[in-house]
Amino acid sequence: MKKPIRNRWIVSKKLRIILWVAIVLAVYMLANTSYLLLNRFADMANLDFFAAGKTSIPILFQVMILSHTGVGILLVILMLVFGILHLPKVWKLYQNKSGLSGIAYVIIGLTLGITGLFILTSAASRENNWAWWLHVICAILAPAGYIVHRISSRGNKPSKVSYKKFGTAIAGLLVVFIVWHSLTNRDVIMTEEAQLAMEQGLHEGPGAKNRDVSLFIEDEFVPVGFVPTESPFFPSAATTTTGGYLPSRIITRNDLGSQEKIKEEIDQYGFVKETAIGATTCNRCHQDIVAQWETSAHRFASFNNPFYEATITDMRDHATEPNMWVQKHVAQYKDFGEDGIGRAKSKWCSGCHDPALMLAGKMNKPIDRNTAEAQAGLTCLSCHAIDKIHNLTGNGNYNIADEQEDPYLFATAKDGSIGAYLHDAAIKAKPDVHKQQMLKPFFRESEYCMTCHKVSLNETFNNYRWLRGQNEYDNWHDSGVALNASRTFYLPPFKRECQFCHMPPEEAVLGDIAAKNGMVKSHRFIAVNTALPYLRKDTSTINRIVKFLQDDKLRVDVFAVSTESHPEPMMALNKGDLTLKAGEQITADVVVRNKGVGHTFPGGTNDSNEGWLEFTVKNEAGTTLAISGFIDEKGHLDKNAHAFKAVIVDKNSNPIHKRNAQDIHVVVYANVIGPGTADIAHYTFMLPEE
């Protein structure tokens, strides 16, 4: 039987063009893939001279990643076109190994394309890393499959010269990539502002990350937390890596929204409520986290918080009593003008409340509350750009890494644009640098929260002396919650950081790419602040706060009862047999136990935060016989209520009612419940004769 006669090439001229284009693209893809694998190996082996790095990512590397995607998609399309046009024809002639290997090759190519596209989607989370491994395996099988297919083709076997040319082209292109990468790979690509600051030596100055504060004090003794008056941020303890003011885009990421929309919201609500200043770009990948943050007290920390705005405005206008430190600072920075004492003192608060304003040098001048920076609150980068906590004194004692911005291509592209898509694709393909910038190991520790939730007031601020302000950190640290106090009634099974309670796992219903097992760390920062959500009519957040507080935080028990006829207190009332007689005086001991609050209850600024007991005695008909802790018709609390709060006064014994911290002189009393401890209230009342 005669063998079928056929040409060396069974493909048409048009298909041959497609094939040659595919081969050229395959050469590029193999060189590209080899380059990317070399980078990965360099990362794993810590070969810093070649690795893409942890803090910066070369432009060439990003181009290679993005072109890997683009060329890969094109190659899969060409392969499909070629297969659809080629396979039916050859299948009729040769139903042998050649045909089967061709089908297998098409399947591998399709899998390669599908997994590659999947990796680019928001579903490409850590739980779905199987897609990456399948993509890698198919990438190895694809060239091998093509070679097997060509070898199994009877008359179309490639020559040794073809192999040599193919291999030489790949190797040559790879060498070009390696040399190019080696010449352009740099550690950190700094902003223009950072380069200028470095040239001026500000990075070694009083406002810098690595400042030596001993150079700015004449005394040999340097107090912990000392802030030089020469610092541009004085009296705030905050610093920047460059040592000077930063462009506000470092904090807002230039996600400023529409100025017209901002003005409309301020006119309607009194503050910006809907525009997510500083979070629009982040929202493209972190939808759940941004949605949570939008409802948080952190977001409403600056001039978008009416309570804080009133306080800081009053301070800037009326805290004008000078002292030698503030005077020296104001004299050095001329933009304060002649009436800058109050504005200078306000920076004590601004390190934690107004970073978008203060770090950009805008607190020195009158504030336009209609600007995006004034309405930004604590943006994503207000926290995630922190790369160092200087010490444990609090007062915003952090450093903002402002020497570089988003190092990925098309970082400034607008939402919905091709540039934005390519930018996000580059991050997803190589997220290491993004993670290194945005997530430091200490973010999981209580010391991270401490920098703003531990406060002291000193003479530079209050013209008086050092005073302790709110201090959640020390209360937590010295308790059983941190496993540092054995005398605590209630010890948790393990050390609980701040984040355990205030950033619990929450289901990522919007598909946040940071989700692990479908959960993200909640960025609602739920605590007890119901005032801000009440202003916004945010009932959902109020309900979450109520649920949070009712989750075994406190336990209230009528612990003991004594009467005139039985003066010895009877405890364990559920097991006792006590009869109360009409006309008799009764004393009830009510115990409040702090079981689930990791610091004092209440926490925060206890001159304004207040809890109380409501104790009511009713008869069988439901008639109230005695009550303590009621709210009167004017909305005021019963003056005789057993309250948990602090009473603080100024030098004239006037209560501190306006959050005017600069006027605090002494604490009259502070009735709070420490973590794992208890408080007791005694209630005495007369039962009526009838």
Q: Where does each model-flagged region fall?
A:
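N-terminal-proximal low-complexity accessory segments that begin disordered
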Residues: 22-30, 36, 262, 268, ...
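Membrane-embedded alpha-helical bundles that constitute the cytochrome b-like, heme-associated redox core
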Residues: 2-223, 230, 239
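Feature captures C-terminal
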Residues: 678-680
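Surface-exposed extracellular loop regions of Gram-negative outer-membrane beta-barrel proteins
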Residues: 351-354
